[in-house]
Structure formats: C-alpha cells, structure tokens
Swiss-Prot record:
Family (UniProt): Belongs to the protein-tyrosine phosphatase family. Non-receptor class dual specificity subfamily.
Record field: compositional bias (Basic and acidic residues): 30-39, 80-95
Assigned keywords, A-Z: Hydrolase, Protein phosphatase
Start-end of Polar residues biased regions: 50-61
InterPro entries assigned to the protein according to its UniProt record, in alphabetical order: Prot-tyrosine_phosphatase-like, PTP_cat, Tyr_Pase_cat
Gene3D superfamilies xrefs: Protein tyrosine phosphatase superfamily (3.90.190.10)
Annotated source species: Caenorhabditis elegans
Protein name: Putative tyrosine-protein phosphatase B0280.11
Enzyme's top EC category: hydrolase
Length: 441
C-alpha cells in the first residue's frame, strides 16, 4: 500500500503541474515547464499489489487488520500532502510571479556560463577597454565621433508618407523614411510612425523603433495595435521616465482590461508588477484583428528608467540586463520585438545601440559604437539625439560586460572607464540643461 501511495502522490503531482501549465497563457512559460519535467529522473512504475508471505501462519483477520491500518495511514498522509499542496498553491498565487522574461534572463546567464560565451564577452571587453585606455583625450574623441551623427541630414523627398500623415506623428521634427517604415497587413494607406531597422553585420534580427501613439487619437491607438499584429511583435520595450506617465496616463495607451477598436481588439490577460525579482512591469495582451481566428500574444515591458531628454543616472545593471534580453528573449522565430519611446528617436535609438554593442561583446569582439550609431541614425532620423545619449550607449554595453569579467585587473580597469564616461555624460547633460534654461529665459 505504501508503494500505491507513492504512485498516487506522483499522479497528484503530475495533475497539479498540468493545472498550472493549463492556467498559463504564455507559450515561453509552457516550454520552460515542459523542459523542467523532461529533465527529471524517470521513476519506475509502482506495483499495484504488495506480495506478502504467510509462512508464519498469520491469520486472515490479522492480515485484514494490518491492511486496514495501512489504508488509514495512507489516507491521512494523502490528506496531509493535499492540504500542504493547497497552502503552497495559495502562496504561489499571492506571491510575486516569475515571468517568462525572468526565466529567460536566468537561463541565458546559465547558458552563457556553460557554453563559454562568458569568455567571449570577457575577451571582447578586454580588447575594447584596452582601446579606450590608449586614448589620451577620450572626451574629445567622443565629441568628434558624435558630430557626423548629429549633423546627418534627412532627405525629405524620401519621407512622403510622413508628410502626408503628419497629424498622426508625435513631432514634425522626427521624420520617417518611406523605404523602411512599418507597413500594415497589406493595406496601402496604413500609417504608423515606426521604422524597421537592422544591422546584418551584427545580427540577423530586425528591430522596430516606434513612437508612442497619440493618446487622444483613437485612430493612432488602433494603428499601433494593428502594427503589433501585422509585424508579429511579441515583445515591446517602452522607455519612459519614472514620473513621465502615471497609472491613468499609461492605461490610455495600454488598457488595464479590454479595449475594442474598429478593426482590432486587445485584452489584458496578465499584469506582473515590478519587484526585486522582476526588474520591469510586464503587461501581457491578447491582440486579435477583426475576422482573425488566431489570438497572438504581445508582452509590453514598461522600462521606467530613462527620463525624457536626459540619460539615466542609476540602475545601470537593470538597464544592461534589459538590453541584453532584447535579442535573448524566447520569442517565435518569425516574430520580432520593438523599442518604443515618446518620439521613438533619441532614447529608443540609443538603447538599440547598446543592444547591438552587447551582441558584439557576446561574439567576442569590441563594438564600434560610432559605426553602430551611424547605421541606426541613417535608418531612423533623430535616433541618438544628444551627446550624453551617445556616451551612455558605451555605459550600457560596458556595464553588461563588467558583469561577465572575472579577471580582477580587467574588472578594475572597466569600472574606471565606466566612471569616466559617466562623469563626462553627466557634465554634458548639465551643460545642455543650462543652455535650455538660458534659451527659455
């Protein structure tokens, strides 16, 4: 009977796992749990009967009594285990959830350790830091590197859709090229201010840089969600300042429950608030175009660490980890991701430079920030708007690299370079603020 109890408990555990899996609507989570189950050691099937000898002449009554006692003990044990599982389940529901991106980030770190990619990152950091250390005047070099980016001209003849739909743009000063603008699901007149960018020499994956929709325009909001569906965007990183949008303002863009437009509806299936284990608030949406049987999911990640017109001065580790997760997220092979800010330009472009620089480090190479920034700016006008933003792209990638450096000497050198860059970026940001104040006066 004890072996029968073992089998019962095993079936109960499997049933509990199945219920949890069924409750989850996120594909990445289901894959993760399936992987965990497959890695468990297989147990031999329990026998349904216990063979007992009667060589000592034990009476039938004694045997029946013994079996009855065992059944009572087993029943009590099963009830106890069942109550414990209920308590555990209740704790899981009230406690902080571990989301797919959290799992993906931890798995990525584990894979990096096992596969040797950590050594690649350290190799790339070593080469890069040595290059930066040789520069006598690193500040002058950064200023000189940023100048051609800042003065890059936009050919307005290649921005016809932008000029035609200027009323649906956050700013008339952030242009949009026709060649790589986001298209809808085949509709000729579809428009949304977003750009498909790619740097094939670094990654085969493309990334969409987009503005936030106009909150007072139902047409703009609808176009935003149509873009998400048409481009199969499964993850969107929303870059805002901590006090830039309150809860009410944020819900105008991303509904707390359900919202229906003329041609598409969105349903908030789950919200995971920011916590110690989860660096950014995550909103999971079911995005269903009209007359579409499928209900694809999109995850909105609220990255409230980057104030408008400035650069972050804290949470470098959180920012670097978020940047590293853009391409390391477990999304479908034919899906894409998007980086969104108010204009989809300065912050979004700078963050993407940091993302691409991390890709280079993971390949064991020192990134050329100037080349990456020039490429992104040539595809998305006004991407990387200020010198402090340009300098901060170095800080993002070096902070990521620092986490994977084991050599104490290299670690110390990397920390020193980050400190120098941070000081320079903050000084330039203060200078720009003073200039803005003088202009306003």
């Amino acid at each position: 009977m004890e072996k029968k109890k073992s089998k019962t408990n095993l079936l109960q555990k499997f049933a509990d796992k199945f219920k949890k899996k069924k409750r989850s609507r996120s594909a990445p989570t289901s894959k993760e749990r399936t992987s965990e189950i497959s890695k468990r050691k297989s147990r031999s099937p329990s026998k349904s009967k216990v063979t007992t000898g009667n060589s000592h002449g034990a009476s039938t009554d004694n045997k029946t009594k013994t079996d009855t006692n065992r059944m009572e003990v087993t029943a009590k044990g099963f009830k106890k285990a069942k109550d414990a599982k209920k308590l555990e389940k209740k704790k899981e529901e009230t406690g902080p959830s571990k989301t797919p991106s959290t799992i993906a980030l931890r798995r990525a770190e584990s894979q990096m350790e096992l596969s040797g990619n950590r050594k690649n990152v350290e190799k790339g950091v070593k080469t890069w830091v040595e290059q930066l250390e040789k520069l006598v005047e690193i500040r002058k070099l950064l200023e000189a590197d940023f100048k051609p980016i800042d003065t890059m001209k936009v050919d307005l003849e290649k921005c016809q859709a932008f000029k035609k739909n200027i009323d649906y743009c956050q700013s008339e000063n952030v242009e949009l090229y026709d060649a790589n603008r986001v298209k809808g699901g085949g509709e000729a007149d579809f428009f949304y201010h977003a750009t498909v960018t790619s740097i094939p020499s670094i990654s085969t994956k493309s990334t969409i840089l987009a503005q936030l929709p106009l909150s007072d325009s139902p047409h703009s909001l609808e176009s935003f969600w149509l873009m998400v569906a048409a481009q199969k965007i499964q993850r969107l990183f929303i870059l805002i300042g901590e006090d830039e949008l309150d809860k009410a303002a944020l819900s105008e863009y991303f509904p707390e429950d359900f919202k229906e437009f003329k041609t598409i509806r969105v349903n908030n299936r789950k919200t995971v608030s920011k916590s110690d284990e989860q660096p950014n608030t995550q909103l999971y949406y079911e995005v269903v175009p009209k007359d579409c049987a499928e209900a694809p999911f999109a995850m909105i990640e609220i990255c409230d660490f980057w104030p408008d017109g400035k650069i972050p001065t804290v949470s470098y580790g959180r920012i670097a980890a978020t940047a590293a997760s853009v391409f390391d997220s477990d999304i479908d092979s034919d899906a894409t991701c998007a980086i969104v800010s108010n204009y989809g330009a300065g912050r979004a472009g700078s963050f993407l430079v940091g993302v691409q620089a991390i890709e280079k480090l993971q390949a064991g190479d020192a990134p050329n920030i100037k080349e990456i920034a020039m490429s992104i700016r040539s595809q998305r006008p006004c991407a990387i708007e200020t010198l402090p933003q340009y300098v901060f792209t170095y800080i993002i990638a070096l902070t990521y690299g620092l986490k994977h450096v084991k050599d104490p000497v290299l670690k110390s050198k990397t920390e020193k370079v980050i400190s120098q860059l941070e000081q320079f970026a903050c000084e330039k940001m203060m200078e720009e603020d003073e200039e803005d104040n003088t202009t306003c006066e």
